[in-house]
Amino acid sequence: MVVAQQLGQWAEQTALKLLKEQNYEWVASNYHSRRGEVDLIVKRGNELIFVEVKARGQGNYGQACEMVTLSKQKKIIKTAMRFLQRYPSYQDFYCRFDVICFDFPQKIAKTVQQDFSKFHYDLQWIENAFTLD
């Protein structure tokens, strides 16, 4: 599980770097409510983007983006709504839900501290991945 946590932290840091390169401003990381968690919250102009980040290595079933189930989407939406209640200055922003996924085609050793950036990976950024509907 330690490697999975390291991979998740690396993926969130890398996703945030990518977002900043696209002129998004960091608002929050790992925002928790009793309903769930949002990995990253960023803004650009009057857009507020709630970002779910997923990473998977070979040997895991399915691709990273497939892990953002309908149940997970509902939890993210409820957590986002709680964020907006807690921080009313963002209530007039246009809200969007994105998913950023990292898929590693190779197996990742479970016992070694990894620099995941040295591995080849496929990156998928899905803007408006899901909506409030």
From Swiss-Prot:
Protein name, UniProt field: UPF0102 protein ABSDF1354
InterPro entries according to UniProt: Restrct_endonuc-II-like, tRNA_endonuc-like_dom_sf, UPF0102_YraN-like
Organism: Acinetobacter baumannii (strain SDF)
Gene3D superfamilies reported in the protein's UniProt record: 3.40.1350.10
Family (UniProt): Belongs to the UPF0102 family.
Annotated CDD domains: PoNe_Nuclease
Pfam families: UPF0102 (PF02021)
Species classification: Bacteria, Pseudomonadati, Pseudomonadota, Gammaproteobacteria, Moraxellales
Superkingdom in the source lineage: Bacteria
NCBIfam families xref list: PRK12497.1-3 (NF009150), PRK14674.1 (NF011267), YraN family protein (TIGR00252)
GO molecular function, one term: nucleic acid binding
